[in-house]
Amino acid sequence: LVRDVMLGESGLAVPVLFLGCGNFGGIGSPPELYGLGDDKETAFALMDAALAAGVRMFDTANSYGGGVSEDWIGQWLASRGVRDEVLLTTKVASPMGPGPEDRGLSRRHIRTQVEASLRRLRTDRIDLYLAHGPDESTPIHETIGTFDELVRAGTIAHYGLSNLDRAGLEQAMTAVDELNATGPANLQNAYSLLDRAESSALFDVCARAGIGFTAYSPLAGGLLTGKYRADQPPPPGSRLALRPDAFGTLNVDDALTAVNGLAAAAERRGVPLPALALAWALTDPGVTALLIGPRSPAQLTSMCAAVDIELTETERAELVRIAEGDPRTIDG
């Protein structure tokens, strides 16, 4: 079974791998991709396999598949009768309708959306409730105060933040202090061998505040799976084919060149590239847990192998050099 670890100083024990449910009924939040991604049968098979492997934190959002992801998780929980064996993360902030009140982190929107998420998930509590991103139009004190109210009411056990830079995280922590509020348990940001700098600059803030850091997209949106090649178009239906804009400022061509070197390093070590890339992120002292998004139970099994791969600081540094285009090898 995948081992558990404490999420910062929250007192919440979580597995070191979370099941990312962003492909259930869609590909993340964009409405134009609703209905793509995994079907319900696949989603149920993934949740069955994840729980059996100890990957018992399911990470979703109100906006994934337009609510379908939460709904399928709720149906699965009801059919399996395992609510007390599973931890749930969901999120709020992304648009859920056309109007300005249908998004963001205002007290009204958070209150409305947490109730909608509870209904879809068929549960009376959310273990970890995340702000899906910053909301420049709402005072941070209003957002933190609302999360604090929900914790005190028992509606959510813990809350967290996502997609913040250092200034945003520090502003949130200042608001926590000024309100004497419950602090966030978690920061969830992108972090991988191909996307390291911005999140690693936050690790010291998280450590000082007792916040656990969870990394989403530890395979860089699938680039570190090895399924994409620099000289070939992306496979039909893949994330790169459907959401080429989802890679932000990352130069995909340069990244795929680096992936060739990383794949060679994985082959020399005798492990799959995705497992090596996940192990690199998981062995970072600043990282608590990773979100994984397998598309089949077999992929889940191969990703879980990452928890048994041990990397020294030297080996981790050599993988970074390869990711930056240095041809030196992991075994010297």
Where are these regions (language model features)?
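N-terminal binding-site loop/beta-alpha segment at the start of enzyme catalytic domains
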Residues: 1-86
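Beta/alpha (TIM)-barrel catalytic core signal, keyed to glycine-rich beta->alpha loops juxtaposed to Asp/Glu
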Residues: 4, 134, 138-324
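Acidic (Asp/Glu)-rich catalytic clusters
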Residues: 9, 52, 76-87, 118-122, ...
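Short acidic capping loops at alpha-helix termini that bridge into adjacent secondary structure
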Residues: 15-16, 83-86, 90, 124-128, ...
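Active-site mouth loops of central-metabolism enzymes
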Residues: 27-41, 96-111, 132-138
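Short, acidic/polar
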Residues: 36-50, 104-121, 169-173
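Hydrophobic residues in well-ordered beta-strands that form the structural core
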Residues: 59-60, 73, 89-90, 161, ...
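Active-site groove signature of glycoside hydrolases
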Residues: 118-139
